[in-house]
């Protein structure tokens, strides 16, 4: 959404000894996104801390500022959900507008100034709700469902960031990494992953276009450079991904983990190797 799979960044043109460059910024047209879930809404905050810190990513910023997020409270959480582990309320997305779909009716509540502005523009399309008890009942039912899910009592171990070296050198990586296929699926479905590559393409005589595209830290050539690859082995790449999620990112972002408990990696990993399994293994390991 704010960090698309592929985006054009620049155009270059060489005429003789003259080089001209054109920056291709996203459209300034307002985009409205309907149905954002609470876990994905939280992921935007995590990405903001990456792309909106100095130096600010102008492409991400432009999309972020021109987008209105309309969240929708969860009514049917997946069995792989564990957003509660990060203090996320699945029934109240952190968006400009919160909505709830109950028995064919859409309940709407503006939260931010941007949400209020959109609500005002909708005018007579919306009407004041006389009774919101149905929303409360749905929220209570959702919480009951969450309380019996397989990961309802799962929590991350708060001591991990304080023991960075021990976590890095743990034997857990040697036990888990061999099962990884390096298929990169987990990184592509994760809403907080943000690795990318930059590619230049010749599109005509003296003309070049630069694109940014998603990449994966699990790929064997992700860190490959002219002088070699600092993470040649699968174990090193596997460890790097989870060290970033569980240790490095929290250390630099007020203790916030780079995970929102959406459960997509649990659903999609072909060998059932995911962040929950890694975190649990580290928690019970004797060398952490």
Regions found by a protein language model. Name each.
Residues 37, 184, 188, 267:
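Short alpha-helical basic/polar micro-motif
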Residues 1-163:
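Iron-sulfur-associated redox domains of electron-transfer enzymes in respiratory
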Residues 42-43, 189, 268-269:
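Hydrophobic positions within alpha-helical membrane elements
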Residues 178-198:
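Basic (Lys/Arg-enriched) interaction patch that binds polyanionic ligands
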């Amino acid at each position: 959404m704010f960090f698309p799979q592929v985006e054009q960044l620049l155009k270059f043109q060489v005429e003789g000894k003259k080089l001209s460059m054109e920056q291709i910024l996203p459209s300034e047209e307002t985009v409205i996104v309907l149905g954002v879930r609470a876990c994905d809404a939280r992921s935007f905050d995590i990405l903001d801390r990456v792309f909106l810190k100095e130096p600010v990513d102008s492409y991400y910023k432009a999309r972020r500022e021109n987008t209105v997020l309309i969240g929708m409270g969860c009514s049917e959480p997946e069995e792989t959900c564990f957003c509660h582990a990060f203090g996320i309320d699945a029934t109240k997305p952190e968006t400009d507008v919160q909505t709830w779909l109950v028995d064919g009716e859409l309940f709407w509540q503006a939260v931010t100034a941007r949400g209020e502005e959109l609500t005002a523009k909708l005018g007579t399309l919306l009407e004041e709700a006389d009774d919101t008890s149905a929303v409360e009942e749905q929220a209570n039912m959702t919480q009951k469902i969450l309380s019996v899910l397989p990961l309802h009592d799962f929590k991350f171990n708060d001591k991990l960031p304080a023991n960075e070296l021990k976590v890095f050198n743990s034997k857990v990586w040697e036990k888990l990494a061999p099962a990884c296929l390096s298929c990169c699926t987990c990184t592509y479905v994760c809403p907080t992953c943000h690795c990318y590559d930059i590619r230049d393409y010749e599109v005509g005589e003296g003309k070049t276009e630069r694109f940014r595209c998603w990449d994966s830290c699990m790929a064997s050539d992700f860190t490959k450079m002219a002088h070699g690859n600092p993470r040649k082995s699968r174990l090193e790449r596997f460890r790097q991904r989870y060290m970033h999620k569980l240790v490095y990112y929290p250390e630099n972002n007020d203790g916030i983990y780079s995970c929102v408990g959406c459960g997509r990696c649990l659903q999609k990993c072909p060998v059932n190797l995911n962040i929950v399994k890694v975190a649990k293994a580290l928690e019970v390991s004797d060398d952490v």
